[in-house]
């Protein structure tokens, strides 16, 4: 069994702030604690970056690649970032 501290949930978003808020709320409601949530903001223009800065969520890591990489590109970017953080398993 993998320790929750070695798990990263990768969430990719682009101009879907309301859906991102729902997704993060669901992740916060998990009974397992200690995992990392890595949000890849694909250069959103809807206030997503500002919203993410206001959060006080343990384990939250935010990345903005500076351009919209698309869904698959965003997940590939997020998985690379998660590996750089030392995670052993990724939720996508």
Regions inferred by a protein language model and the residue ranges of each:
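Cell-envelope/extracellular polymer assembly enzymes that use nucleotide-activated donors
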Residues: 6-8, 36
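Short beta-strand-to-loop acidic/aromatic patch adjacent to the donor-nucleotide binding site
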Residues: 86-92
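Glycine-rich, basic loop-to-helix element that forms the pyrophosphate-binding segment
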Residues: 65-85
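Short, acidic, metal-binding catalytic loop of nucleotide-sugar glycosyltransferases
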Residues: 25-34
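Residue-level preference for short helical/loop micro-motifs built around acidic side chains
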Residues: 18-21, 46, 50, 73
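Active-site beta-to-alpha loop of glycosyltransferases that engages the nucleotide-sugar donor
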Residues: 11-22, 43
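Short beta-strand/loop segment that forms part of the nucleotide-sugar
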Residues: 35-43, 63-65
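A conserved acidic beta->alpha catalytic loop
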Residues: 26, 41-50
């Amino acid at each position: 069994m993998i320790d929750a501290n070695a798990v990263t949930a990768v969430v990719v978003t682009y101009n879907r702030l309301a859906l991102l808020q729902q997704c993060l709320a669901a992740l916060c409601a998990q009974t397992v604690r200690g995992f990392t949530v890595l949000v890849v903001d694909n250069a959103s223009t809807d206030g997503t970056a500002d919203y993410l800065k206001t959060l006080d969520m343990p384990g939250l890591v935010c990345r903005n690649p500076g351009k919209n990489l698309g869904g698959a590109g965003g997940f590939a970017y997020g998985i690379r970032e998660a590996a750089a953080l030392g995670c052993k398993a990724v939720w996508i």
